Curated annotation (Swiss-Prot):
Protein name as annotated: Sec-independent protein translocase protein TatB
Biased composition (Low complexity): 99-115
Pfam families in alphabetical order: TatA_B_E
Protein localization: Cell inner membrane
Lineage: Bacteria, Pseudomonadati, Pseudomonadota, Betaproteobacteria, Burkholderiales
Signal recorded as keyword: no
UniProt-annotated stretches for the region Disordered: 99-118
Main location class: membrane
HAMAP family for this protein: TatB
Keywords noted in UniProt: Cell inner membrane, Cell membrane, Membrane, Protein transport, Translocation, Transmembrane, Transmembrane helix, Transport
Length: 175
């Protein structure tokens, strides 16, 4: 910025005193100080905004890197699962086709749906629940109260009137 020392500031003050006079100098000095302070605040705001944008950009790149790493891990896990499933299906099919009586009974007992039985079809349990009431009775009452919609909505004035003692109530006047 500007290199203003004490001697230069004193020289500027003397010139301003001579040019402006002692009556207007304090008002001009206050105005100049206010403008200088406003300029400093503006510069500090711009610096803060730039640093926030830089941090935000760094966070965005970090987020994208993290998401990419998560996708890579997910793809690796899915690939490994598919490979193991293929191995299990191959072992199951070889055991069924070789005439192993235990495997043949197991696949015939549950009724495999496809021509090529898989280890999943044998291990799969029936998905439908026999008693649909089990789900409703398993939900706690406090959860039902907290999540259900209110069916009896009461205004604030009605709520105050309901809980106000009868000794404090005003008598109702009808015309």
């Amino acid at each position: 910025m500007l290199d203003l020392g004490l001697s230069k500031m004193a020289l500027i003050g003397v010139v301003a005193l001579v040019v402006l006079g002692p009556e207007r100098l304090p008002r001009v000095a206050r105005t100049a100080g206010a403008l200088f302070g406003r300029a400093q605040r503006y510069i500090n705001d711009v610096k803060a905004e730039v640093s926030r944008e830089i941090e935000l950009d760094a966070l965005r790149t970090m987020k994208s890197d993290f998401e990419q790493a998560a996708r890579n891990v997910e793809n690796t896990i899915h690939d490994n699962l598919r490979e193991h499933e293929r191995d299990l299906n191959a072992a199951w099919n070889s055991a069924v086709s070789s005439g192993d009586p235990a495997a043949a009974d197991a696949s015939g007992g549950l009724g495999a749906t496809s021509d090529e039985p898989s280890w999943r079809t044998v291990a799969a349990a029936p998905a439908k629940r026999r008693n649909w009431r089990v789900k409703k009775t398993a939900t706690p009452v406090w959860y039902k109260r907290a999540t259900m919609r209110r069916t009896q909505v009461q205004s604030g004035a009605a709520r105050v009137a309901r809980h106000q003692p009868s000794s404090l109530r005003r008598p109702a006047r009808f015309f």
